[in-house]
Amino acid sequence: MPIQVLPPQLANQIAAGEVVERPASVVKELVENSLDAGATRVDIDIERGGAKLIRIRDNGCGIKKEELALALARHATSKIASLDDLEAIISLGFRGEALASISSVSRLTLTSRTAEQAEAWQAYAEGRDMDVTVKPAAHPVGTTLEVLDLFYNTPARRKFMRTEKTEFNHIDEIIRRIALARFDVTLNLSHNGKLVRQYRAVAKDGQKERRLGAICGTPFLEQALAIEWQHGDLTLRGWVADPNHTTTALTEIQYCYVNGRMMRDRLINHAIRQACEDKLGADQQPAFVLYLEIDPHQVDVNVHPAKHEVRFHQSRLVHDFIYQGVLSVLQQQTETTLPLEEIAPAPRHVPENRIAAGRNHFAVPAEPTAAREPATPRYSDGASGGNGGRQSAGGWPHAQPGYQKQQGEVYRTLLQTPTTSPAPEPVAPALDGHSQSFGRVLTIVGGDCALLEHAGTIQLLSLPVAERWLRQAQLTPGQSPVCAQPLLIPLRLKVSADEKAALQKAQSLLGELGIEFQSDAQHVTIRAVPLPLRQQNLQILIPELIGYLAQQTTFATVNIAQWIARNVQSEHPQWSMAQAISLLADVERLCPQLVKAPPGGLLQPVDLHSAMNALKHE
């Protein structure tokens, strides 16, 4: 068979195999188009589970007459025009394949009118070449799409359709997911002429829990712990059910959204599961409705034709961010109740050294009274009840920050600290005016060596070795401990009994090195590290450090600092002149003994005399 270009209808039918899996897939694509068009009301009419009719009617901006034919063409879209648009996509659709694919396996009719047009127009495609016919029609501003006889021309696909009830249940689930993503849109779902679901638009933030209860049920609403967690460009909002009261019925509620797009992402599910693992049974699953907001440039949605999956550019950061956000609200729920002194009129719950969900470690409350309220992770329709201070909250309810006054002062001090890093404590007196130095940097050789000129001699200096000595000097405490830098997202690791015992024995020494942690039964939470470790991959470095400590019988700060300095990763895979000059200036200031007596592997003289003699001619 010779190579030939496929007919448009066949090409679209092949694409439909990826996009149009069942009637619910059609509903998803068409409703998302309505939302992208700015619709505030979408009516979905279904007959015979979607096999006979799928009608989507919206009050969006509509489609111009001259663009109707393009709307049914493959790879035609109004949502992106360049690669930059694709890399920063915020609309739900962008591939330009849905309508063409659907029309190739059904009898599709598109009717639309814009506010500028006096009349509406109707388009439909038919035949082998998918020729589009456009004619006048009566229709208000907005768009209606009718999909008749789905898979009528692909009998093999039609055989795989399930019963009418099963297919409609899938459609119902899609509408539930969309309703949770867009509280500002009214969604009406009808089946065989009967209104089955009606989700009214939320006028105020305080009514969101009403729609949440209508979709997820009262049991989930009663056990929901609100989350609002933020760090940099990442924001996590929503609800997670209290694992201590999660039932089998609730475990079916697992809804996750990335920038408003419904997702089934293993990374997100793993982070949530890991945060709840200590409170869930082996056969239990967490229940949650979570919304992740992230810079569109940091996530790739062009992974799956149906757009069910995403790929994060910094997946480890996203995983840890979600894990810490969920873990924080769960820990607030289970903290032991402690009395407050001069903070609240009655004994209230104060989680020691904890933060409110949705706040970073350095967040300062807008009002002083905000810090005086305990965490309020649950809410219900009524006022406080028998569960101890359950309150109804408006909008995105979240736990109020609870911490002690002394901790608040520490956080304010941290906030007022200049962004420039303080100079590390010198381990030896600095050289006066750099009377002794390595010399002048001439160039970089091999990417990690500096060619130096000093007093008429030429030397090669290993920059990674110099950096290791500098780190050891920065990590070794002088007259005072090394300054600890709190982590915005603490690192929680599972440890063995031997590792936990070693950490407890070395805790005071690690504190002098700027490493602060808290431990519980099976885990250790790293809360602060010294400045040289802030940019390191702590997920790898800290477990290796714990393993090293578990193998030691005695501990010394110098040995621990030396081990860390040897095992940290260099921040400079390729060195520049400016970086080399800055490094040598720091080494000369903090490690003058290296200038006087360079250790092995740091400096290597270059014999210029031999080279010059080789060039001399008789």
From Swiss-Prot:
GO terms for biological process: mismatch repair. Transmembrane segments: none annotated. Residues 383-392 have a biased composition (Gly residues). Residues 366-378 have a biased composition (Low complexity). Pfam families: DNA_mis_repair, HATPase_c_3, MutL_C. Residues 366-403 are annotated as: Disordered. SUPFAM superfamilies: ATPase domain of HSP90 chaperone/DNA topoisomerase II/histidine kinase, DNA mismatch repair protein MutL, Ribosomal protein S5 domain 2-like. One of its GO terms (molecular function) is mismatched DNA binding. This protein is involved in the repair of mismatches in DNA. It is required for dam-dependent methyl-directed DNA mismatch repair. May act as a 'molecular matchmaker', a protein that promotes the formation of a stable complex between two or more DNA-binding proteins in an ATP-dependent manner without itself being part of a final effector complex. HAMAP family: DNA_mis_repair. Belongs to the DNA mismatch repair MutL/HexB family. This is DNA mismatch repair protein MutL. It comes from Salmonella typhi.
